[in-house]
Amino acid sequence: MRHSRLIFYEKVFRGPFLLGLLCVFILTAIVSARAQTFTVIHNFTGLDDGEQPAAGVTIDAAGNLYGTAWDGGHGYLQCQSGCGTVYTVRHTSGGWKFETIHLFLGGNDGAYPATTVVLGPDHELYGTTYAGGGQQCVNQACGTVFKLRPPPTACTTALCPWLETVLYRFQGGSDGSGPGYGSLRFDAAGSLYGTTIWGGGGTGFGTVYELTPSDGGWTENVIHRFTGSDGSGPESGVIFDQAGTLFGTTVDSGSQGGGTVFELSPTSAGWVENTLYSFDPFDPNGYFPIGGLLFDDAGNLYGTTSTEDEGRGGEGVHFSS
């Protein structure tokens, strides 16, 4: 699929491998005409720039874009088609300029960045890799949480690269394995929150975790381990409401077997999980909610399911809560 400009797809598939949107594009509104201008600003080649940029982009205050490519970059023994990249597309007076700012090697630094990066309060980039983190995890879903520090403003050459720091390497056991496809979230105190699709102990149904900065490092705390009855496979990450409660979805299991919507409330005794809704594969409301959640101004939750009622053979629904 390399050198493709754009691939439109109708169905939503599990896993990042089949998401083949192979370009960065921009839609510019022409207000007077109520129209949109579609412009491709970069075509991925699968080489140093990466391949399969499925996670979307983040924009900074200056209008620069940042994103990840699942694989590509370089070929290594650990991941022969490349272990993925982080890139930026800067808006300059001469047009858009694409730059690869990190190539993953597949070892201690991680492999396969499945989510886009987010900007932290320190203006550095934070993200996760689905695999890697150590030699024992190269071809397994252990994964990492990382940050990328930009070069000094005065330095404009390739001799001043972005600096990667791995904040946490998942061990694949009770601490979780395979960070989910949703972006990381910061709280007001600067802690990071995310999910792992696997791991968490004997059940291996996934976790919600917190990373807290302390003494120059980061400490992981698993705030919930899924058991199956409350869902499994929290692929899409979590979001906060204004009260500091976390909300997310699991793609599978739950009391009805088709995934769940859940909340995690902070209390003096720790985080308390509550299942808000369990999806039924034989219900027209759909099931397997792979995507993330979104609040409107009134506090309603919105999301999607990837599949609809097995008896009807549907292709998914939108839902609100």
Protein language model regions, located:
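Extracellular beta-propeller repeat domains
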Residues: 2-321
